[in-house]
C-alpha cells in the first residue's frame, strides 16, 4: 500500500488485516521499530483526537516525528502545500499525514508527488476520513465480534460528514447486515453508497446494535441550512429516551468533538453503553496499523 487515502481503494482483505493488526497491537503491546522512517504531520484544520493519536502511533513505532506549525511556517507567506511537501521531502521526510479542508486534496497530492512520498489522509473536507472508519470498526468488532448480523445506525449531519462517507464504504466492504442513516431531510445526502436513509429517529434506532452520533456543525446550521438547534435537539438528539429504541446492549459511539446537550446528552455520552473513549484508545492502535502497512510495503 503506497498511500492511505480512501476506504474505497482498499480491498476487504486489506481492511480486515488492518483491524486485526490494530487489535494485536492493543492486546500485546508489542510494536515494531521504524527508527529510520521520518514522518511529518500537516494539519491545516484544527484537531485534537486525530492529530495526537497519529503522533502517539508514530512514536510507538519509533518513527522520527515532525509536527509542522502552520502559524510559523511559510504557509503564512502563501507557500502552496505541494511546495511545502517537496521541501520537506528534500530534507528526507517520506511520510506525510495531512488534514485539509479541501475535498480530494490528498489524492491530488498523491497523483503529483506519489513517486517520492507516502500520503496519509487524516480528513479532507466533507469527503473522507478513512482512519476514523478503521478505528470505529475496530471498536465495533472488539465488542460485537461479527458484523453480518448487526444493525448500525448513524445519526446526524450525513450530508456534510466525511466520517459518514468513509463509514458507509467500510460497512459495504465488510458486509455489515444493515446500515441506517438518520438525518433531517435537509442534511440527507444526494447519493448513498450503502444503507438506507430516514428522517424518523425512533424507527431508525429500532433494534440497533450500534448507534453512532455525529457532531452537529453549528456553523453550517446558522449559515447554510437554516435549521435551528432547538429543532434538531427536539427531533434528533440521542437521549436516554431515544436510545431506548435500540437494543439494551447497543453500543453508543461518537467521533468527537461532542456538543453535549445538542446531538447527545451527557447521561448517554457518559453512560454504561458509551464506547466513545474506547474509540479514542483504539484510534492510536488503528493508526499504528495503517502506518505499519505503508512502511512495510
From Swiss-Prot:
EC number(s) given by UniProt: 2.1.3.2
One Pfam family named in its UniProt record: OTCace
Catalytic activity: carbamoyl phosphate + L-aspartate = N-carbamoyl-L-aspartate + phosphate + H(+)
Pathway(s) per entry: Pyrimidine metabolism; UMP biosynthesis via de novo pathway; (S)-dihydroorotate from bicarbonate: step 2/3
Broad enzyme group: transferase
Binding positions for L-aspartate per the UniProt entry: 77, 162, 215
GO MF annotations in UniProt: amino acid binding; aspartate carbamoyltransferase activity
Binding-site positions, carbamoyl phosphate: 49-50, 99, 129, 132, 256-257
Keywords: Pyrimidine biosynthesis, Transferase
CC per GO annotation: cytosol
Protein family according to the UniProt entry: Belongs to the aspartate/ornithine carbamoyltransferase superfamily. ATCase family.
Function comment: Catalyzes the condensation of carbamoyl phosphate and aspartate to form carbamoyl aspartate and inorganic phosphate, the committed step in the de novo pyrimidine nucleotide biosynthesis pathway.
HAMAP family: Asp_carb_tr (MF_00001)
Quaternary structure, from the entry: Heterododecamer (2C3:3R2) of six catalytic PyrB chains organized as two trimers (C3), and six regulatory PyrI chains organized as three dimers (R2).
Identification of the protein by name: Aspartate carbamoyltransferase catalytic subunit
Species annotation: Legionella pneumophila subsp. pneumophila (strain Philadelphia 1 / ATCC 33152 / DSM 7513)
